[in-house]
């Protein structure tokens, strides 16, 4: 092909010699250098879309979209048709071909799944683009600098917010108290990277739900009093049932120094229907801490379900008095507890339940099953699975757990518990 100065079709970037990797369904733009071109023909692997932009001022931008799945059914001509996108440019008797190679990464892109109508499950709750057709949907990238999320929170949110986050070099941050008054869903976009969220002050639930998936939640700055003394509270839930769910799914909660959730213990504040933590690693670096702290909450009847499943809760050194969930005496409840709680398939390393792992007023059921508890033998404390502080008849299942370590006893229930199961005895055999 003759080389002439007024005819060119090429990719403007100089770093396109390697294969360009896409997530399933992802779209990327490539700027072309085009001179003297009269006609073009584009070929792409089966399932891929490649076309020039119709947006004004971007006529020389090639828009490439990967198929929604990684299945490859290639039938096209033009060299290696399983990876090549080729542009044949012509001008009279002259012709030129520009090519790039593309492939789909072997990873999940939750944003692409959402765009293509797939269900995303977070703590048993399904989200998709039909349920959230009116949401404010954002893709945010912390590759080059910290990204502030403050503008996505307010006490008067008119629509749900879904944030797909990517980039691990820097943090996503919030400063000051953040109010949640509609559904807020925060998802690490790619399943093979976990972005970091670092709040400076607490988040206040008002209405809706709060869902996390595939996020590292760094709580290092929440180690003070007042608004830095916990991560999430219910200080804005002023009507029964306004805030339905807090779900943390497939996350890392790092450097826990204060409660993850805290009930503000006011008669005018209501509870959260469902709290779920699953498939999550939790790094605890504090003694005598309740991860979910109902404190002296009044409206206990609003807490319906608590699910704590498939988590790893750990510390480098034994932490005394760690609680998974706690309600403290001191206020007379306005409604009795009806909580159904499941603590299943977890691993606890150096977490000592000397203040009782699960401590509540009344409940309908409690399952603590198929967990592993391992504490360094030098820890001189007893450890207790549960205590109900008022008389009730919940269904109790505290079976198939394995315990190691401690110089003192592992016990099913605290001696002050008004529910005592199993009736055959309180001591748990160590392994």
Over which residues does each language-model region extend?
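A short beta-strand micro-motif common to beta-rich folds, especially ectodomain repeats
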Residues: 1, 72-93
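Solvent-exposed, low-complexity, repeat-rich "mucin-like" stalks and linkers
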Residues: 3-47
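Low-complexity "stalk/linker" and mucin-like segments enriched in Ser/Thr/Pro/Ala/Gly
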Residues: 41-67
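Extracellular beta-strand-rich solenoid/capping regions of secreted or surface-exposed proteins
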Residues: 68-69, 158, 171-186, 194-243
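Acidic Gly/Asp/Thr-rich repetitive segments characteristic of extracellular carbohydrate-active
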Residues: 110-166, 171
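Acidic, glycine- and Ser/Thr-rich low-complexity intrinsically disordered tracts
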Residues: 115-120, 130, 390-431
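Extracellular beta-strand/beta-solenoid scaffold signature
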Residues: 175, 196-204, 220-239, 255-269, ...
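Right-handed parallel beta-helix
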Residues: 183-185, 208-219, 242-255, 270-288, ...
């Amino acid at each position: 092909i003759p080389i002439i100065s007024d005819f060119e079709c090429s990719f403007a970037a100089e770093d396109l010699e390697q294969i360009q990797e896409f997530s399933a369904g992802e779209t990327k733009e490539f700027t072309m250098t085009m001179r003297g071109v009269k006609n073009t023909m584009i070929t792409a692997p089966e399932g891929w879309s490649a076309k020039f932009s119709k947006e004004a001022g971007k006529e020389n931008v090639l828009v490439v979209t990967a198929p929604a799945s990684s299945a490859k059914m290639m039938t096209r001509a033009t060299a290696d048709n399983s990876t090549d996108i080729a542009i044949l440019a012509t001008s009279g008797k002259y012709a030129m071909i520009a090519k790039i190679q593309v492939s789909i990464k072997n990873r999940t892109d939750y944003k692409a799944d959402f765009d293509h109508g797939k269900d995303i499950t977070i703590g048993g709750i399904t989200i998709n683009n039909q349920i959230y057709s009116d949401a404010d949907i954002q893709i945010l990238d912390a590759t080059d600098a910290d990204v502030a999320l403050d503008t996505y929170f307010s006490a008067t949110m008119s629509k749900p917010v879904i944030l797909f986050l990517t980039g691990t070099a820097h943090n996503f941050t919030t400063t000051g108290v953040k109010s949640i008054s509609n559904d807020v869903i925060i998802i690490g976009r790619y399943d093979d990277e976990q972005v970091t969220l670092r709040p400076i002050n607490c988040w206040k639930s008002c209405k809706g739900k709060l869902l996390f998936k595939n996020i590292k939640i760094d709580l290092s700055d929440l180690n003070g009093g007042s608004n830095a003394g916990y991560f999430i509270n219910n200080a804005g839930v002023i009507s029964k049932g306004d805030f339905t769910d807090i779900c943390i799914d497939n996350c890392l909660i790092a450097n826990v120094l204060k409660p993850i959730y805290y009930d503000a213990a006011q008669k005018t504040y209501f509870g959260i229907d469902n709290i779920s933590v699953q498939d999550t690693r939790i790094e605890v670096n504090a003694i005598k801490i309740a991860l979910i702290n109902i404190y002296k909450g009044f409206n206990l009847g609003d807490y319906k379900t608590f699910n704590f499943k498939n988590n790893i809760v750990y510390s480098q050194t034994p932490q005394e008095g760690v609680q998974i969930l706690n309600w403290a005496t001191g206020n007379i409840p306005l409604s009795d507890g009806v909580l159904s709680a499941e603590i299943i398939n977890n691993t606890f390393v150096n977490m000592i339940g000397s203040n009782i792992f699960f401590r509540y007023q009344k409940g309908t059921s409690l399952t603590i099953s198929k967990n592993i508890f391992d504490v360094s033998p030098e820890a001189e404390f007893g450890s207790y699975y549960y205590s109900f502080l008022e008389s009730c008849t919940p269904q109790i299942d505290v079976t198939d757990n394995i315990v190691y370590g401690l110089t003192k006893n592992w016990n099913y229930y605290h001696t002050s518990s008004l529910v005592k199961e199993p009736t055959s005895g309180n001591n748990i055999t160590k392994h």
